[in-house]
Amino acid sequence: HFLRMISGDKSVKYTGEFKLGARVNPGYFAQTHSHPEFMGKTLLELLWENYSLQLGPAKSVLRRYEIDQQAEQKFSSLSGGQQARFQVLLLELSGSTMLLLDEPTDNLDLASAESLEHALGRYEGTVVSVTHDRWFTRGFTRYLIFGANGKVYESPEPIFEH
């Protein structure tokens, strides 16, 4: 619920308060890659419809996420890792300055998870992730622990190291 809460999801119930910086624009990456609105459309079609990107600029942004070779493929035919990278790209194009990733490597094979991690490494904003993937956390610099009492603590290392 934490990620949905800070993404602005009004259906999440919580007590207390939080405030994001004035220039923080959160973008939520759901645990599932279910996007019925993407079905039947190629990556180029989606980039044109949502961001008016013509062929050259569209291929350029797809190349940054190592999915330019899939430009003409339908979203549904992409691997899990390719779908994840495309979704991160869309969040970036939407102006998100803080990515909220809910189990981003869940159901990805190792190669797909590595590709996603590589793409996130090039992202210039803040990345907040909820994950149970020990491998994925190795590049993180800060860890938050959610206690049973509802309090949030910062830790110098991931909790599964304790």
Question: Can you say where each PLM-predicted feature lies in the sequence?
Answer:
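ABC ATP-binding cassette signature C-motif
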Residues: 1-162
